[in-house]
Amino acid sequence: MAPTVMASSATSVAPFQGLKSTAGLPVSRRSTNSGFGNVSNGGRIKCMQVWPIEGIKKFETLSYLPPLTVEDLLKQIEYLLRSKWVPCLEFSKVGFVYRENHRSPGYYDGRYWTMWKLPMFGCTDATQVLKELEEAKKAYPDAFVRIIGFDNVRQVQLISFIAYKPPGCEESGGN
């Protein structure tokens, strides 16, 4: 017996004709009088400055700002505390990453700083952190001191900024 093949009664689908024009979509419509025309800021901006490539090293989060005043430090620390982060102080004689013994990255290349005491778990007052900063500055006047904010839930460092630069440090711009 020969097998019988039954013709399918399904409807046929039109062949693919290519992508439709998106001109009818609201995203692609452009108004000719939107006011943007040929946008260019190249000729109008004259106040933008470039960070010098020599003489002033860049540090951490707030490197491009002038040195922080005590009021600025208090505001940053209060933000850190409001965000429920744990403040920690770290210090180092060399305030930047360097490699003196090997070409590849390693533990002793300046990425890891020495922690000042323990993280300040439970700290709720920014002035407590400033007191610790003053103690660190007194104990190590020729070291950089940074404040970091640690999230103990996610176990990550979320903010880090230099709070003190040693005097006479020309590559840091002084303090």
Swiss-Prot record:
<keyword id="KW-0113">Calvin cycle</keyword>
<dbReference type="GO" id="GO:0016984">
    <property type="term" value="F:ribulose-bisphosphate carboxylase activity"/>
</dbReference>
<dbReference type="InterPro" id="IPR024681">
    <property type="entry name" value="RuBisCO_ssu"/>
</dbReference>
<dbReference type="Pfam" id="PF12338">
    <property type="entry name" value="RbcS"/>
</dbReference>
<comment type="function">
    <text>RuBisCO catalyzes two reactions: the carboxylation of D-ribulose 1,5-bisphosphate, the primary event in carbon dioxide fixation, as well as the oxidative fragmentation of the pentose substrate. Both reactions occur simultaneously and in competition at the same active site. Although the small subunit is not catalytic it is essential for maximal activity.</text>
</comment>
<dbReference type="InterPro" id="IPR000894">
    <property type="entry name" value="RuBisCO_ssu_dom"/>
</dbReference>
<dbReference type="InterPro" id="IPR024680">
    <property type="entry name" value="RuBisCO_ssu_N"/>
</dbReference>
<dbReference type="InterPro" id="IPR036385">
    <property type="entry name" value="RuBisCO_ssu_sf"/>
</dbReference>
<dbReference type="Pfam" id="PF00101">
    <property type="entry name" value="RuBisCO_small"/>
</dbReference>
<keyword id="KW-0601">Photorespiration</keyword>
<protein>
    <recommendedName>
        <fullName>Ribulose bisphosphate carboxylase small subunit, chloroplastic 2</fullName>
    </recommendedName>
</protein>
<dbReference type="GO" id="GO:0009507">
    <property type="term" value="C:chloroplast"/>
</dbReference>
<comment type="subunit">
    <text>Heterohexadecamer of 8 large and 8 small subunits.</text>
</comment>
<keyword id="KW-0602">Photosynthesis</keyword>
<dbReference type="GO" id="GO:0009853">
    <property type="term" value="P:photorespiration"/>
</dbReference>
<keyword id="KW-0150">Chloroplast</keyword>
<keyword id="KW-0120">Carbon dioxide fixation</keyword>
<keyword id="KW-0934">Plastid</keyword>
<keyword id="KW-0809">Transit peptide</keyword>
<comment type="similarity">
    <text>Belongs to the RuBisCO small chain family.</text>
</comment>
<feature type="transit peptide" description="Chloroplast">
    <location>
        <begin position="1"/>
        <end position="46"/>
    </location>
</feature>
<dbReference type="GO" id="GO:0019253">
    <property type="term" value="P:reductive pentose-phosphate cycle"/>
</dbReference>
